[in-house]
Amino acid sequence: MRGINPVLFKISFLLIILVSLILSLFYYNFLFAFLLSFILFGITWAYCYIKIESTDKGKLLYEIKRPGIETLRFLFILMIISVFIKSLLHSNSFFPYISFLLSNLILGLVLFDDYILGNPTIKFYEKGVVFDRVAFYNWEELDIKEDEGYLKIKIKYYPKEIMYKK
């Protein structure tokens, strides 16, 4: 594998954002914390991009992009519900930190499931596969099966099988 493990990359990005949000609650400087998290994410992503682009992958054979419009609609509805819950809890003079955490718990769980374990973008090359733009795997590192019109891909250190309709 060249690059970084996609799951660890995404989890580290979410942890950086979570820490910056917690720091912004105490220091009231949300913009600085937000920019710092995206600078750290950008440096890590640039490192992965350079590692993958310097690898001899061969010719691009096929690309599978992640479906996302249904998930985005669902997340938008959850964000509206989250704001509503936050306003209800804040109006009853609960602690603002507790209302912040409770109102965004559901949204965070859905984001975790879709962002971390959702179907990633995969590019098939002659010599291997680029997985979610942050890791390149040789064909020997993959377990690919075809079953009932689905392409099932199992990648080492990825928690679930990835299924795509052919």
From Swiss-Prot:
Tell me the disulfide pairings in this chain.
none
- Locations listed in the record: Cell membrane
Offer a single GO CC term for the protein.
plasma membrane
Quick one: where is this thing mainly located? membrane
Report keywords, A-Z: Cell membrane, Membrane, Transmembrane, Transmembrane helix
The membrane topology term of the UniProt record is: Multi-pass membrane protein
- Residues passing through the membrane, by range: 7-27, 30-50, 69-89, 92-112
Please report which protein family the annotation says this sequence is part of: To M.jannaschii MJ0795.1 and MJ0785.1.
This protein is called Uncharacterized protein MJ1249.1
This protein's species is Methanocaldococcus jannaschii (strain ATCC 43067 / DSM 2661 / JAL-1 / JCM 10045 / NBRC 100440) (Methanococcus jannaschii)
Name the lineage. Answer: Archaea, Methanobacteriati, Methanobacteriota, Methanomada group, Methanococci
